[in-house]
Structure formats: structure tokens, C-alpha cells
Amino acid sequence: SVGFKAGVKDYKLTYYTPEYETKPTDILAAFRVTPQPGVPPEEAGAAVAAESSTGTWTTVWTDGLTSLDRYKGRCYHIEPVAGEESQFIAYVAYPLDLFEEGSVTNMFTSIVGNVFGFKALRALRLEDLRIPPAYTKTFQGPPHGIQVERDKLNKYGRPLLGCTIKPKLGLSAKNYGRAVYECLRGGLDFTKDDENVNSQPFMRWRDRFLFCAEAIFKSQAETGEIKGHYLNATAGTCEEMMKRAIFARELGVPIVMHDYLTGGFTANTSLAQYCRDNGLLLHIHRAMHAVIDRQKNHGMHFRVLAKALRMSGGDHIHAGTVVGKLEGEREITLGFVDLLRDDFVEKDRSRGIYFTQDWVSLPGVLPVASGGIHVWHMPALTEIFGDDSVLQFGGGTLGHPWGNAPGAVANRVALEACVQARNEGRDLAREGNEIIRAASKWSPELAAACEVWKEIKFEFPAMDTL
């Protein structure tokens, strides 16, 4: 007789282990599971653990050649989701040895690679990951981090200001460079390539890099401040991406940019390592994130993508605004903003944080607030994001009736007024409008901006609720 029984078996016999004590080296995952009708939650949770680690749908004789106990993922806890019918949070522990060191790509291929198409589940969402120090220590992380960036730029005690150059597509390189120069001269710290500006027929990347570098050095000479423009190095191949980053370094500019989800984690990690070795800051745009994170019951929450970026490497990442035109619930947004910036973040379910996360010494990432924001939002943004952030006003700079430079002046004046008011102990949430009005009395540029945007609001209920 054969030594094992073939045939389909219940996952929960092997992979549901409620008595398991998690190890400090385990990677822990919280999945929101919606089983098909008739599938018990324990079986669904165990199936997730199995299919994202060692399991397959039947017993195979090669199981006898390894130690499943050592390598299997385990579903160790299941709880119903309050207010949702037939949704559960399944907690899964993965042994560290299942993952290649220093590879976000491999971590995601394992944890979310296959299991999301699993038939026994109606839907599946990865809500959070606990990355143990034993694993984070195999990553370089952000090229420089918050403190080193401030030292490089010599800018302290306030959020940094940026602006995405619009119209995003169609400008020639020279006109584009001119728009960059006007914004930087007016008082912004950074300007930005739009995420879809790569190297198109109307503006090839090399021309753009040259004209933007000229704009940076001219505005630096005039203002006495260090300036930057996020030169988008994203390209169709990794080799071409590196070529663009190398050219940026040769021009002597301070920062480049990458679309980390469309470009991919492998490309992003290579670029981040190049940036650290060559003193370039790295701005990360999250184009495509909403495809993955917008649905409440399926996909991956952005806090997981944010943690992955901190491991793969980036000095800035877009993180929603809480107040502008794009998605972002306040407490949840602040939860992943802290996961990006802080060394140690306590578990706090009210902010969507399922696990205590200890980053040890991995550098932090500056969150970027961008999308439909303008001068009237400045007090709220200063209050919500604090000093360690980048506030980006695209239309909110370039839409100024007098042009880009006055638009930049208006934003800088508004920001300095808010920071000063906060440092004097005033309550930005309550007195914000008053602070902006007072500042606009002595800044005609700000007064004009206040007039243009006084009525504009983007008010829709947020999808991203707990």
C-alpha cells in the first residue's frame, strides 16, 4: 500500500493553527477574506495560508521530502469584520525562510501572487503586513531618508513645497523648462515631472533634463536656496531607466523620480540603490495604486504598498491629501503616513494599523500631499502632515491668474504664515482661514490666489473607511 493518501483534503487540517504563537521573525499578514457561500471561515483562512506558502490542492508525495512544519504559512487567528456580513480578517504567519532576502518582488509574489484568484473566495484583500526586523535588515530602504534630505537641501522646520508642471503632456522642452524656472524662482523647493511624462515625441527626455537643469541652476543663483525638479527616469526598460538616472547625476541635479508600481519593484530597488550610491534623492509616484487599493473588499490596502516602498527605496512618496480631489480618509491616511516616517508604530486598529511595526534604523520616507489642493488648504495640510512632508500644488500654483512665479509666491507666503502661526501656538484647524486672510493683506500674490480658489471644493464621501 502507498505511504500517503492522495485526493483533495481540507486545508484547515494542516494550515489552521489557532494555538500557534507567532515568532518575532515571522512575516505576519492580515487578510480581509470574503468566502464563497458555504465555505467556513477557518477553511477560507487556511486556504489563503496554504496557497500563499507551501500548499497545493492535493497531497503530493514530495511533501514527504520537506518539513511542512518548518515552512508552511499558518492561519493563526480569525475574526469577523464588524458591520460586514460574511467578511473575516484572517491573520497568517509566514516563516521568514519562505522569502528571498532584499526582494520586495519575491515577497509579493509569495504573499499575493496566486491566492487572489482562488475559487473558494469571493474576494480577498491584504490589509496589512508586519515586516520583522530580521527581514527589513536585508533591504537598503530609502536612498537617503528625511534627515539626510533636509541636510542636503538645508531646509528645516517646515514642510517642503512642490508643484507638478501642467499641462502634463504637450509642452516642448524649452517651454517646460521655463515653467519650472518660474515656479522655483517664486519660492517653491521642487517642481515635478508628471508621472506620465517619460520620453514622448513632443519632448524627449534628454532635452527635458537639460532645460530643467538650466532652470534649477538659474533659480538657485537668484534665490540663494537649493532647488530641485523631479526628473522622471521611468522608462520602458531598466537599462533605459538607469541611463536617464546616470544623465541626471552627470548634470548635477539633486533628485530624480520613478513610478514604482508601473515601473515595478525590481526596477525601483535597482534605481534606489543607484541613487544612494550617487547622492541622488528619489521621488516616488504611485501611479496605478488605485487599481490595486481602491476596492474595499479586494486587492491590497495602500499601507501595504507604502511599507513595500519603504523597503524597496524612495525618499518621497505620494500619500493622498485628506483634503483635496483624491481619496484619503484622515485617520487611515495618517496611519500609513506614520508607517512611512516613523521608526516604530504601535498597532492601532482605529487607524487601520493591524500590527506593531518596528523599522529599526530603516530611513523614513517623506509623504507627499498632492491633488486638488490650493492656498486655502494650507493650514489644514500643515496641521495634518506636520513638518516632515512635501505639499504639492500643481493647478494650485500654475492656475494663479498672474502666472507661475506669483502662484509660487502665494503658496510660499501661505506656508510660512501657517508655520509661524503654529509655532506661536495658534490653532490652525480653527483659525486657518483667518491666518491666510491676514497674510494676504501684505501679499498681493496670495490675495489674488485666495480670490480665485475661495469657492472650490471636492466633496465626495471617502471609499476608504475602516
From Swiss-Prot:
Record's cofactor remark: Binds 1 Mg(2+) ion per subunit.
CDD domains per record: RuBisCO_large_I (cd08212)
Pfam families, sorted: RuBisCO_large (PF00016), RuBisCO_large_N (PF02788)
Residues that coordinate or bind Mg(2+): K192, D194, E195
PROSITE patterns per UniProt: RUBISCO_LARGE
UniProt keyword Lipoprotein present: no
Presence of keyword Metal-binding: yes
Main location: plastid
Annotated GO biological process: photorespiration; reductive pentose-phosphate cycle
Active site: K166, H285
GO molecular function: magnesium ion binding; monooxygenase activity; ribulose-bisphosphate carboxylase activity
Listed cofactors: Mg(2+)
Residue numbers bearing the N6,N6,N6-trimethyllysine modification: K5
The protein's enzyme class: lyase
Catalytic activity entry: 2 (2R)-3-phosphoglycerate + 2 H(+) = D-ribulose 1,5-bisphosphate + CO2 + H2O; D-ribulose 1,5-bisphosphate + O2 = 2-phosphoglycolate + (2R)-3-phosphoglycerate + 2 H(+)
EC number: 4.1.1.39
PTM notes: The disulfide bond which can form in the large chain dimeric partners within the hexadecamer appears to be associated with oxidative stress and protein turnover.
Site, as annotated: Transition state stabilizer: K325
Cellular compartment(s): Plastid, Chloroplast
GO-annotated cellular components: chloroplast
Further comment found in the protein's record: The basic functional RuBisCO is composed of a large chain homodimer in a 'head-to-tail' conformation. In form I RuBisCO this homodimer is arranged in a barrel-like tetramer with the small subunits forming a tetrameric 'cap' on each end of the 'barrel'.
Subunit structure comment from the entry: Heterohexadecamer of 8 large chains and 8 small chains; disulfide-linked. The disulfide link is formed within the large subunit homodimers.
Family per similarity comment: Belongs to the RuBisCO large chain family. Type I subfamily.
Protein name: Ribulose bisphosphate carboxylase large chain
Organism of provenance: Vitis aestivalis
Encoding gene per record: rbcL
